[in-house]
Amino acid sequence: MADCLTPENLAAEHLSIARTAQEFWTAEVVPHLAAIQRQDPGVLLGVLRKSADLGFTGISIPERFGGMELDLASVMIVEECFARDASYLVTHGAQAGIGALPLIYFGSEEQKCKYLPQLANASMIAAYALTEPQAGTDAMAIRTRADLTPDGKHYILNGQKMWITNGGLADLYTVFAKVDGEKFTAFLVERAYPGVTPGAEEHKMGLHGSSTTALYLDNVAVPVENVLGEVGRGHIIAFNALNIGRLKIGPYAVGASKEVLALSLAYAKERKAFGTTISEFGAIQHKLAEMAVRIFAVESLYWRVVGQIQQASAIKDLAQECSMVKVYASEAVGYVVDEGVQIHGGYGYHQDYAVERFYRDARIFRIFEGTNEINRVLISRDQEVGTALADIAIQTFALESAELRAQKLGPHAQDMCALIRHQAEERIESATREIHAARGSEPPVRPPAAPVDTIALRRKIARRLLDAGRYVV
């Protein structure tokens, strides 16, 4: 197996970015978290624009347009730091990620000169408008139309978008429409254009602090100069953005899970029951260890893919790997937040405790960027037994990533890897039986695996976590 990127072998400049992001988070975001959740007017935008002063909103934008032009690893570091509040994370991501990347990759020189400096300094807020009421993961089913005017100077857009992050804040939307009802095309649409109307704020289960609205387009005249890329080639832009979005669920899952684990460790060490702290209970140690193991696996998986993308310089060649990260990471963080609430007991169900917010926020990530069900189909390309085949591929890739990383680290990483291996083998075996049952064949007979004392491994991992009070490898 080839060498791969891990968080332990990041460069000095990456560690510097991590420190800067952490300092910004502590000084500028944490004091405003409650106000962000309440959507107090101006607070979220104010924090976002302060992040622009440090270059975070222009992290991927070329320097000549006022950005930092940092590599993908740097972007992931910032995403992981900001993941401690998903509302702020998705707001920042819509600005610095899917709001800017299509323009960076596919924009004309004139478009870049006009818009990128304003996106970099956050004087202009960006949003990405693809989803429609009848077209979610099936993006090619959109109905928004774009018709060229007789003089050839404008496209007239008509349609409705929904679930638009930053929808109520944005000044510039990347809108997808079908030219003549057929040619899937991207447009740069300014909010100031007549006929552009954001809808009311949606009332969501989670992400309470972020702006999510519909977008209505009523005879909107968009200059032909604002076609992004080529007419009929908008799917390339959309799918590249989806791949990046799927990959970014990796750092979200790790950042959120680390915070929930730290909160759970602190609570378990303080909460007493039957004369002792609940951290001494085997059932609680089991949960804490499993939370850490999932963090290690997701961390190993997504950093490996980041390294592969940086070496390949093209994300389109790693679309399946991005889908694997999306599925594995979103399901891992779902487990972690659920166990975090369980460790907190009744307090975990109360809004005064942060784990309640993490629990609500995490649920969307199995739906974002294409549902996990559709991503499994994309991984396997086999409709009949696609889910089982995808699960085998995901578990194998995650296990291999963890093993590659553990080879570079000490015995504690080996312990976590042993648990990952044990669980992956069980899931692969179950998926294999499902495939053979569906096809009416007998699964191969394999010799029994060597027994693994998973209870002892979990106790050992949990004790190390409790001693440190946080996630450690």
Regions inferred by a protein language model and the residue ranges of each:
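Long, acidic (Asp/Glu-rich), low-complexity accessory segments flanking structured domains
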Residues: 219-237
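Short Gly/Pro-enriched turn/cap motifs at secondary-structure boundaries
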Residues: 92-93, 134-137, 163-166, 178, ...
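Alpha-helical interface subdomain recognition
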Residues: 1-84, 89, 106-111, 118-123, ...
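Short glycine/proline-enriched turns and hinge-like loops at secondary-structure junctions
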Residues: 70, 138-140, 166-170, 208-210, ...
